[in-house]
Amino acid sequence: MTTTTATATADPAEQAHQFPLPKILEYPASTPPILITQGAEGRLYKTTYLLPDIPCALKYRPPKPWRHPILDQRLTKHRILSEARILAKCRRDGVRVPAVYAVDESAGWLMLEWVSGGPVRKSINERLGNRTEGIENDAELKDLMRRIGTAIGNMHKVGIVHGDLTTSNMMLEPLANPQDDNPLHGELVIIDLGLSSGSISDEDRAVDLYVLERAFGSTHPRAECVFSEVLDAYGQTFKQAKVVLKKLEDVRMRGRKRSMLG
C-alpha cells in the first residue's frame, strides 16, 4: 500500500471516523483492528480476524468522496483484485511476498499474511550507525544487497514490476534460530504491491530498478558505494536481465536530462 500522506482536507482520524471498517471486519476478532498506517489511497491495519493467534495485515481502501461513486467502486475493485492476483502469482512462482488470506473487492479490502520483522531501511540504517568509512568493505551489507538484487530479478523474471521499489517496501523476516540477532539476517520479503503490474517490458523493469536506485541514494547516501551489488546480483537472475541493465543506462540518462531542465 502506498503510504503517501493524505491531503490536508482528508485528516486521517476524520477519514477513519467517516469511513470506518466494514462491520464484518470488526467481529469476531478477539481484539479490535489496530491502525498501523494511513495513506492517501487506503489504510493498513493489524488484525486477528481469522484466528486469535494469527495476526493478519488488513488493507482497506475506503470510499473516495471526491469521486463519482460508480467510478470509485470500479477503481477500488480493479486495484484490490489486481494486487491480490499479482501476490498470488508471485507466491505460485516462488517470489517471497505476503500470502493472500481473504479478499472482498466490493467492500474494498484485502487480508494478507502479517510479516514479522522490520523494513530493510531500518536494518541498513542500524548497520551503518554513525560510520563514514569501511562501508564498501562490509561483507554482510553487500550480501544483503545481493539478496535484494536476486529478489527483484526473480520478481521481474515472472513478469511482475513493483512500481514503488524502496527499502521501506522490503521486510526482513527473522530466522527461526533465536540465537541469530543480526539485523541483516532473515528472509527478504517484498511488500506493498499496490502499484505493481504485470509486464515483461525491459523498459518497465529498468524503471523499477531506477526508482529503487534513486530512493536508495536518498535514504542511504552513505551506502551508495554498495548498491552496485544489487545490480550485479540482478544481472545473474534471468536471461533478459543484462538487457534490462543496459536499458537502465538509458533511463538514467533521461533522468539526468530532466533534472537539468528542471
UniProtKB/Swiss-Prot annotation:
InterPro entries: Bud32, Kinase-like_dom_sf, Prot_kinase_dom, Tyr_kinase_AS. Coiled coil: none annotated. It holds the Pfam family Pkinase. Keywords: Activator, ATP-binding, Chromosome, Cytoplasm, Hydrolase, Kinase, Nucleotide-binding, Nucleus, Phosphoprotein, Serine/threonine-protein kinase, Telomere, Transcription, Transcription regulation, Transferase, tRNA processing. Its main location: cytoplasm. SUPFAM superfamilies: Protein kinase-like (PK-like). Its EC number is 3.6.-.-, 2.7.11.1. Component of the EKC/KEOPS complex that is required for the formation of a threonylcarbamoyl group on adenosine at position 37 (t(6)A37) in tRNAs that read codons beginning with adenine. The complex is probably involved in the transfer of the threonylcarbamoyl moiety of threonylcarbamoyl-AMP (TC-AMP) to the N6 group of A37. BUD32 has ATPase activity in the context of the EKC/KEOPS complex and likely plays a supporting role to the catalytic subunit KAE1. The EKC/KEOPS complex also promotes both telomere uncapping and telomere elongation. NCBIfam families: arch_bud32 (TIGR03724). This is EKC/KEOPS complex subunit BUD32. It comes from Gibberella zeae (strain ATCC MYA-4620 / CBS 123657 / FGSC 9075 / NRRL 31084 / PH-1). The lineage of its organism: Eukaryota, Fungi, Dikarya, Ascomycota, Pezizomycotina.
